[in-house]
């Protein structure tokens, strides 16, 4: 671990300096829960693939990055691909399709990092895909709304009445 601005950072092996969420508030890494450790891993994974760039005059990619924790414990990442038509894809759906490509379909946690570096909620299309993917249990998927303040909601709270 490294010291920077009073916080320890891990994930250096992945090329990303990520402040440990729990240590920012308590000053202690040893008291970090499994849940906090998972969110830190998701943040580091998303940050590692975030690389906003122009691919062509019609396509930009990587401004938003997402990481999904599958129920198995594996993490899947994706980046947004924006096009000048409707052919683009959000980072969250890209990560979900990566998960499906690798034989999994059950989501536990979702974290997306926006171009400004903050985390935020998935858009309606991404929420809809998660609901359709897990119609019996989507309500329990955890979404990191604000990594800095540790604000987390479930997809059920964000999408309380699907297809009334």
Residue ranges and their predicted role:
Residues 2-7:
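Extreme N-terminal basic, low-complexity initiation segments
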Residues 90, 94, 125-128:
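Short amphipathic alpha-helical face segments that pack within enzyme cores
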Residues 60-70:
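Short beta-strand scaffold segments in enzyme catalytic cores
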Residues 74-75:
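Hydrophobic "anchor" residues
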Residues 79-93:
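Compact, glycine-rich, soluble single-domain proteins
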Residues 58-60, 81:
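Active-site segments that bind and position negatively charged phosphate/pyrophosphate groups
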Residues 91-111:
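Short, solvent-exposed cationic patches
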Residues 9-11, 15-55, 104-164:
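C-terminal binding/interaction regions
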């Amino acid at each position: 671990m490294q010291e920077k601005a009073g916080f320890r950072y891990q994930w250096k092996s992945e090329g990303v300096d990520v402040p440990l969420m729990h240590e920012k508030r308590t000053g202690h890494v040893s008291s970090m829960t499994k849940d906090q450790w998972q969110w830190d891993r998701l943040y580091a994974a998303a940050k590692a693939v975030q690389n906003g760039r122009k691919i062509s005059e019609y396509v930009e990619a990587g401004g938003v990055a997402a990481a999904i924790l599958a129920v198995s414990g594996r993490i899947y990442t994706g980046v947004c691909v924006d096009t000048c038509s409707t052919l683009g894809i959000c980072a969250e759906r890209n990560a979900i399709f990566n998960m499906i490509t690798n034989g999994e379909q059950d989501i536990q946690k979702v974290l997306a990092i926006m171009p400004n570096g903050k985390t935020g909620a998935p858009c309606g299309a991404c929420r809809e895909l998660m609901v359709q993917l897990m119609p019996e249990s989507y309500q329990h998927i955890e979404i990191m709304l604000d990594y800095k303040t540790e604000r987390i909601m479930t997809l059920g709270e964000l999408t309380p009445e699907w297809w009334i």
